[in-house]
Amino acid sequence: MVGSIFGWLGLLFAGMPVGFSLIFVALAFLILTNSTGINFAAQQMLGGIDNFTLLAVPFFVLTGHLMNSAGITERIFNFAKSLVGHITGSLGHVNIMASLLFSGMSGSALADAGGLGQLEIKSMRDAKYHDDFAGGLTAASCIIGPLVPPSVPLVIYGVVSNTSIGALFLAGAIPGLLCCIALMVMSYFICKKRGYMTLPKASRREQFKSLKEAFLSLLTPVIIIGGIFSGKFTPTEAAAVSSLYALFLGTVVYNTLTLQGFIEILKETVNTTAVVALMVMGVTVFGWIVAREQLPQMLADYFLTISDNPLVLLLLINLLLLFLGTFIESLALLLLLVPFLVPVASAVGIDPVHFGVMAILNLMIGILTPPMGMALYVVSRVGDIPFHTLTRGVLPLLVPLFIVLALVAVFPQFTLLLPELFLGYGQ
């Protein structure tokens, strides 16, 4: 089994896609050990994606792409500018606020970086902001998306760990807001030190105009969250409704979405969904082998020999995820490793909802750290900024995010307050 894990890492570093590498290693293990046949492996893989809740993933991805292509991102950016553009930090705060608002529609960090990134960086460049700060802040602010509902990573975590997605959505809201506030504080000090310009304060008329233009877009998270918690529809149905609503805005209300553009959006959605589905298939069969070999129990026993103190275990798990997140794609870690860490956390009384939000925040910090740093690569491409410049700009912004991660890990009330208040979770 250890050889299989090292084999998988070897294939991963050689450039093989995560899903293919997992399937290849799993099939090789089954053949070499004369275990159950290939037919069983195929059944496991198909069973892994035969899940109604996972249908939320392509619909949320589709919603994000529709919002990007329908001109909605510019409306959100202008609304954020009218609210906080006059505060010291100006376009830095606008960048963060726009990411927070957009996160309620897409739920994906990379969709945020790719959709808002170009607009945010151009605006900051025009205002004489340096590329390292503009690009670094754009990358850092995009991690708010996977925490604030709706969130694709939270849906995936809920499926693989059998945890309530509704509770996870509520649990991620406060940590997402904390990340927003922490980044704004750091942005304030950096902008003040560098002497960046501050926009004039928008008048009430201008604020109302920008709100009017963005209002229907801002209703998207209200429809999603309100529908779920009023019992009108499930998270999967909410994702489908949000896609239809985004399509309605782009074609009927704003009339900015063309047929050719819609076809391209569908292609991008299929490509993204196929990558996720392939990973889920690979993780399902590989996870079955890992479970059969009792690796999760061995891992739990090992951690418990070090300490049975929840805070010590959370520290060790966070360090492990931060280390692995620097060179392994975050979605792969979420699918492969996190489900096996949940029993370790549960063994010492750590709530799975609290653990899930903490783990996803940790993994999102991982997409900001080189050499993997997927958000850095996306921002580098859309903003035409050298990778080393982005790395220099994002490093000081990791400090407030680490502080938020520590607060979330130590104080579960940040994650469990809203689920307990609105859902009676844990009672």
Curated annotation (Swiss-Prot):
Q: What Gene Ontology molecular-function terms does this entry list?
A: transmembrane transporter activity
Q: Which domain of life is it from?
A: Bacteria
Task: Identify the GO cellular component terms for this protein.
Answer: plasma membrane
**Where's it found, cell-wise?**
Cell inner membrane
Q: Which InterPro entries match?
A: DctM, TRAP_DctM
Keyword entries, A-Z: Cell inner membrane, Cell membrane, Membrane, Sugar transport, Transmembrane, Transmembrane helix, Transport
Null-mutant phenotype, please? Deletion mutant is unable to grow on N-acetylneuraminic acid (Neu5Ac) as the sole carbon source.
* Topology of this chain in the membrane: Multi-pass membrane protein
Disulfide bridges in this chain: none
Q: Would the keyword Iron be found if you checked this record's keyword annotation?
A: no
Q: Name one Pfam family in it.
A: DctM
- State which residue ranges cross the membrane: 11-31, 52-72, 82-102, 140-160, 165-185, 214-234, 246-266, 270-290, 301-321, 322-342, 348-368, 394-414
Q: How does it assemble?
A: The complex comprises the extracytoplasmic solute receptor protein SiaP, and the two transmembrane proteins SiaQ and SiaM. SiaQ and SiaM form a tight 1:1 complex.
Family designation: Belongs to the TRAP transporter large permease family.
Known role: Part of the tripartite ATP-independent periplasmic (TRAP) transport system SiaPQM that catalyzes unidirectional Na(+)-dependent sialic acid uptake.
Full protein name: Sialic acid TRAP transporter large permease protein SiaM
